[in-house]
Amino acid sequence: TLETLTNESFVKDALKNAGLDASKHMIAVTSETSPLAKSDDYLAAFFMDDYIGGRFSSTSAVGGAVLSLAFGPEVFAQFLDGAAAEDALSKNKDVFKNPAMLDALIGVYERNVLGYPSTAVLPYSQALSRFPAHLQQLDMESNGKSVNRFGEPVNYPTGPVIFGEPGTNGQHSFYQLLHQGTDIVPLQFVGYK
C-alpha cells in the first residue's frame, strides 16, 4: 500500500542519512509471490499467505516479526501457545464452553434479531486501549460486505458498527449517550485480573 511504501521510504532515508546500509537493518514480511520476496534490499524475508490482512495479523509473520523484535521470540511463542489454546476452545460444540461461539451468537442476535446497529467495547485497562480498534478491523472488515461469499446480494444486516475506548476515557464522552440517550447500544465490558 502507499502507506507502507511511504513508511519504508522514510526508514530507508533515515538509515541512509545515519550512514547505514538499509539492506542490513530491514526485514520484509510479504507473500512468497510478492516482488519483495526475492529482493536483496532486506536482511531477511518472512512469508505469510496473501489473503491475510497485515494490520492486526498478530499470529502471522507480521505479528511475529514485531513481537519478536520488541519482546523476544519466547514471548511470541507464548502468544502463539495462547492462540492455540483459544483455537482449541473454539472447536468445542458446547456453546457454553466455547466463548468465541457464544459471543458470535450474541452478536448476531443483537444485530439481526433485535436490530441494534452498534456495539461498544469498553476495556477497563489503558493497556487495552487499542483493543476496540483491533475488533473493528477483525469484525467490520470481515463483515462489512453487501454480498455473500458467492457474490450474491444479502438482505440482512451483516454486522454492527463497533466502537469503544477504555472506560476511564469514555466516561466523560460517549458514556453520556449510553447511559441517558434514546438508543440501546449493547456493551461489552473487558476486564482482567
Report each predicted region and the residues it spans.
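Glycine/threonine-rich flexible loop motifs
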Residues: 2-6
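Active-site phosphate/pyrophosphate-binding segments
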Residues: 7-193
